[in-house]
Amino acid sequence: MLVRTPDGCRYDVTDPRLAGELGTGLRVMRLDRGAFDAMPVSVISDSTVSALCTLARVPGNELRFRPNVVVTLDSGVPFEEDEWVGSAVRIGAAVVRMDRRDSRCIIVNVDPASGLPGSRLLQVVGSARRACAGVYGTTVLPGLIRVGDPVVIERRPQD
């Protein structure tokens, strides 16, 4: 699998230069079972991650949810991103249409550090949130997103 960086370089996903290029703690994890996302963009707030992980009594780690974007909300209110469904949201230079809540699967039970299953996080998400946490979106305007970029709701759905 090839990854294309924002400046156009291409790397095999296992190439150690990819982590150096991205400047983050990138880690590739091989799972025995396949996993996929239903939409191109997955957004979750750190407040949502914290609330659900606290309920499940597991360390608060957004990697369990495999999002493309983690946002810090000024309000600190968990699940606020649910209200964005139907909205156009600017994240950095990109605009994303928030299409629907993100239905979670068993992979949230996998410890991102060890790759081993073992938590009851999905059970908590299922009972507390109808198995949804975060939102799925579609890119309307491609653009660069950087850590710390503002998140602005540009258009809300009409009531």
Language model feature labels by segment:
Residues M1-D159:
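Metal-cofactor-dependent catalytic cores
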